[in-house]
From Swiss-Prot:
One of its GO terms (biological process) is response to heat. The gene is hspQ. It is found in: Cytoplasm. This is Heat shock protein HspQ. Its main location: cytoplasm. Involved in the degradation of certain denaturated proteins, including DnaA, during heat shock stress.
Length: 105
């Protein structure tokens, strides 16, 4: 079993670019189509580690879905981000849904 470092609804930062994001899904290993060598420079160890579907904002404040390796992310220590309140709201909404899911018939 592979343990993931981050959880769904957790706020994270891109380690190199510093962008704030929210984890919306986790894959136990890289699971998109087989990348060509020039598209993704990864080794087998990196591909076998968890990968995260993360929502971030572009420069215009529009949501962008990204797919990132665990090694590309770091924990976010702050709970509030006045410059990106939509990321705070998304994280709260996801965590709330995980704590009290609605049952459907």
């Amino acid at each position: 079993m592979i343990a993931s470092k981050f959880g769904i609804g957790q706020q994270v930062r891109h380690s190199l670019l510093g962008y704030l994001g929210v984890v919306v899904d986790i894959d136990p290993e890289y699971s998109l189509d087989e990348p060509s060598p020039d598209e993704l420079a990864v080794n087998d160890e990196l591909r076998a580690a968890p990968w995260y579907h993360v929502v971030m904002e572009d420069d215009e404040g529009q949501p962008v879905h990204t797919y990132l390796a665990e090694a590309q992310l770091s924990s976010e220590t702050q709970d509030e981000h006045p410059e990106q309140p939509s990321m705070d709201e998304l994280a709260r909404t996801i965590r709330k849904q995980l704590q009290a899911p609605r049952l459907r018939n």
